[in-house]
Curated annotation (Swiss-Prot):
UniProt GO molecular function: ferrous iron binding; manganese ion binding; mannonate dehydratase activity
UniProt source species: Pectobacterium carotovorum subsp. carotovorum (strain PC1)
Catalytic activity: D-mannonate = 2-dehydro-3-deoxy-D-gluconate + H2O
Cofactor(s) listed: Fe(2+); Mn(2+)
Protein name: Mannonate dehydratase
Family note: Belongs to the mannonate dehydratase family.
SUPFAM superfamilies tied to this protein: Xylose isomerase-like
InterPro entries with a match to the protein in the record: Man_deHydtase, Xyl_isomerase-like_sf
Keywords: Iron, Lyase, Manganese
Lineage: Bacteria, Pseudomonadati, Pseudomonadota, Gammaproteobacteria, Enterobacterales
Length: 398
């Protein structure tokens, strides 16, 4: 596996010097300063590449070239946004960058209710509390029809939860959900959020799939011609929320994507934390089934709670993900590719990390503090090395 590290650009509290000291060789980043839908120019791409090269690092994966909301809803200037996306892919390829992660989640990227969930050891994790989210939908956002998504018992629990909240807690929960987490390119006020949700009225699962299919048919041929590996990120959490459809949550969704545009350049970011939230997702089977289309991996573990729709982020080698089996499957695919002549390892990054030790005293991007990810990367590296030394000696020699 190629060991990479997510970096949010010059304003990231974690510096490129820190990244090198963590042992990563590749960087996963994006041009966050360019508005969604606009072309990434060769000049801007080369500028970012030069920043990384000056620190002895390479730009391994783009995460992400954002998909404009008008592409997802097929409204406004969506065809122009697609044309701009195509040109950004060509420009990235011209600059030698060949792996692009993206997602097709409506309105919000990843969603959490608590960004400072305190674990028994005193470190902090990200959490999605289903009842807290219900309280937001039913009593803060007051989304029409939201009650249809919750049982009577969940509605009662949400009402109790909301009644016990202070104004400060209401503001914090609202901000956690709609203000934009790291990697999200847009944040909203409550009124803006309601308006954005309304843009999806009449767009169900089938319609959003149709729109994704159109997008794929437009961009995959460009990716093929340019030598770009597209890697769609799964929904997080992997189920419908806020009355919005989700189209990349299960093995059936992966199968649909492959069949819709059957090209090796139409692939996946295999995020164990996102897919792993669902107990009915067999991660190893999913990975092995679509191994040849996995172009990028996010390795982290989540812990499902008593309410199966609630979860928090666990340590990388704990929780509901069998990380040893996952890395074993990744290495098996790398060996297959190596024998077929493709010697490039699959880029991997330690996804998220607990806020811990000295980082508890610092301002950090939620989920992206340095020390927790450093710990995760070291653990994942150890698993990989042990497997290479025992089961994948050919890769070790390679």
């Amino acid at each position: 596996m190629e060991q990479t590290w997510r970096w949010y650009g010059p304003n990231d509290p974690v510096s490129l010097d820190d990244v090198r000291q963590a042992g990563a060789t590749g960087v996963v980043t994006a041009l966050h300063h360019i508005p969604n839908g606009e072309i990434w120019s060769i000049e801007e791409i080369e500028k970012r590449k030069a920043e990384l090269k000056a620190k002895g690092l390479v730009w391994s994966v783009v995460e992400s070239v954002p998909v404009h909301e008008e592409i997802k809803t097929q409204t406004g200037n969506y065809q122009q946004h697609i044309a701009n996306y195509q040109q950004s892919l060509r420009n990235l390829a011209q600059c030698g960058i060949d792996t692009v992660c993206y997602n097709f989640m409506p309105v919000l990227d990843w969603t959490r209710t608590d960004l400072e969930y305190v674990l028994p050891d005193g470190s902090k994790a990200l959490r999605f509390d289903h009842i807290a989210f219900a309280a937001f939908e039913l009593h803060i956002l007051k989304r029409h029809g939201a009650e249809n998504d919750y049982t009577a018992d969940e509605q009662a629990q949400a009402a109790d939860y909301f009644r016990a909240m202070s104004e400060e807690e209401i503001a914090r929960l609202t901000g956690n959900i709609i203000a934009g987490l790291p990697g999200s390119e847009e944040g909203y006020t409550l009124e803006q959020f309601r308006s954005r949700l309304a843009e999806y009225d009449g767009i169900d699962h089938a319609k959003l799939r149709e729109h994704l299919g159109h997008f794929l048919r437009e961009i995959v041929p460009v990716a093929e011609a340019a030598g770009i590996r597209l890697a769609i990120h799964p929904d997080d959490p992997p189920r419908p929320i806020l009355g919005l459809p989700r189209v990349m949550s299960t093995i059936d969704d992966m199968r649909w994507l492959k069949q819709t545009v059957d090209s090796l350049h139409n692939g996946f970011t295999f995020c164990t934390g996102s897919y792993g939230v669902r107990a009915d997702n067999d991660l190893v089977t999913m990975l092995e089934t679509f191994a040849d289309r996995v172009h990028f991996t996010h390795l982290r573990a989540t812990c499902r709670e008593d309410n199966p729709n609630s979860f928090h982020e666990g340590a990388h080698l704990q929780g509901d993900v069998d990380m040893v089996a996952i890395i074993n499957a990744i290495l098996a695919e790398e060996l297959r590719r190596q024998k077929a002549g493709d010697r490039r390892p699959i880029p991997m990054r330690p996804d998220h990390g607990h806020q811990m030790l000295d980082d508890l005293k610092k301002k950090t991007n939620p989920g992206y503090s340095a020390i927790g990810r450093l710990k995760g990367l070291a653990e994942l590296r150890g698993v990989e090395l042990a497997l290479k030394r025992t089961l994948f000696t050919e890769l070790q020699q390679g």
